[in-house]
Amino acid sequence: MEDEIAALVVDNGSGMCKAGFAGDDAPRAVFPSIVGRPRHQGVMVGMGQKDSYVGDEAQSKRGILTLKYPIEHGIVTNWDDMEKIWHHTFYNELRVAPEEHPVLLTEAPLNPKANREKMTQIMFETFNTPAMYVAIQAVLSLYASGRTTGIVMDSGDGVTHTVPIYEGYALPHAILRLDLAGRDLTDYLMKILTERGYSFTTTAEREIVRDIKEKLCYVALDFEQEMGTAASSSSLEKSYELPDGQVITIGNERFRCPEALFQPSFLGMESCGIHETTYNSIMKCDVDIRKDLYANTVLSGGTTMYPGIADRMQKEITALAPSTMKIKIIAPPERKYSVWIGGSILASLSTFQQMWISKQEYDESGPSIVHRKCF
């Protein structure tokens, strides 16, 4: 690769797609990973109606569209829509020709093999990229925090996972995955707001609730105590103005919603909370590296952006770990984008340049080359 041709870094999340150029310190484009199609044919007479809309445009026209997320729980489930999202990323958001740039994509840990093969195939065959690479999201987050050893608790919109990493390599036997993330919390908030008498049901209204969640929710350090405070005073109540001007008030829902991360039983799920999952992940690792993992627990992803989450993690993991263990939870302020930032760092390294899968290698070996070259 000549120096002047920047690689493209695309972090395809279940909720948001983050894209930009390697070497930049933040993504240039961040937009919802959604494809919208008109609910009724021909409603928008004379608007030059398109058969599909992507990202922010789909979001702004959501009233007349059915919105679909092609990535569920971190895994691509609809490849036609995924292709639309990539097309939109390259041509509309970044305004680049993909055949001129190497492309670094990200994927969830423990992704099915067929998934990354398909990604590889689409990049080379549909977009004709000269080179590409698929990196594991959590590993990139760790790089972004300036470490090569640690455990990453990465929680986005569609999936949460704990990934222990030693000297730059993820330890697959100890990776744990939890299908509980931001989208589930949004749905849960919709449900508990309904109990308060507010009604949110459509895909468009779900986006409003997501906004309420992002602006008003927080994690309680002590849930029972916080419930007591909420019951005895109105000090925790906040109001929110809906798009139509109606104002709603929200109280204990503010911390009941993200509490589900620590108590999945709130959602009717029989899994361990994020604190216990992190601990279990550490316990699956060699006894000699556990100390390094406890001292380098890195939070990453948009669902770790709740105020109070780091303190609560510290408290919960301290309760589970041996009493003398030093525990440090690292919550970088830019953790919403740390996967992308790590990708930007990785793709700019001179040592990384021989790691790319080239078009030539792809033509010789086919999509399975991705398992040999990307880890």
Curated annotation (Swiss-Prot):
Its EC number is 3.6.4.-. CDD domains: ASKHA_NBD_actin. The modification N-acetylglutamate is found at residue 2. It is an enzyme of class 3 (hydrolase). The modification N-acetylmethionine is found at residue 1. Pfam families: Actin (PF00022). It is found in: Cytoplasm, Cytoskeleton; Nucleus. Oxidation of Met-44 and Met-47 by MICALs (mical1, mical2 or mical3) to form methionine sulfoxide promotes actin filament depolymerization. Mical1 and mical2 produce the (R)-S-oxide form. The (R)-S-oxide form is reverted by msrb1 and msrb2, which promote actin repolymerization. Keywords: Acetylation, ATP-binding, Cytoplasm, Cytoskeleton, Hydrolase, Methylation, Nucleotide-binding, Nucleus, Oxidation. Belongs to the actin family. Actin is a highly conserved protein that polymerizes to produce filaments that form cross-linked networks in the cytoplasm of cells. Actin exists in both monomeric (G-actin) and polymeric (F-actin) forms, both forms playing key functions, such as cell motility and contraction. In addition to their role in the cytoplasmic cytoskeleton, G- and F-actin also localize in the nucleus, and regulate gene transcription and motility and repair of damaged DNA. There are three different beta-cytoplasmic actins in Fugu rubripes. In vertebrates 3 main groups of actin isoforms, alpha, beta and gamma have been identified. The alpha actins are found in muscle tissues and are a major constituent of the contractile apparatus. The beta and gamma actins coexist in most cell types as components of the cytoskeleton and as mediators of internal cell motility. Polymerization of globular actin (G-actin) leads to a structural filament (F-actin) in the form of a two-stranded helix. Each actin can bind to 4 others. This is Actin, cytoplasmic 1. It comes from Takifugu rubripes (Japanese pufferfish). The lineage of its organism: Eukaryota, Metazoa, Chordata, Craniata, Vertebrata. The gene is actba.
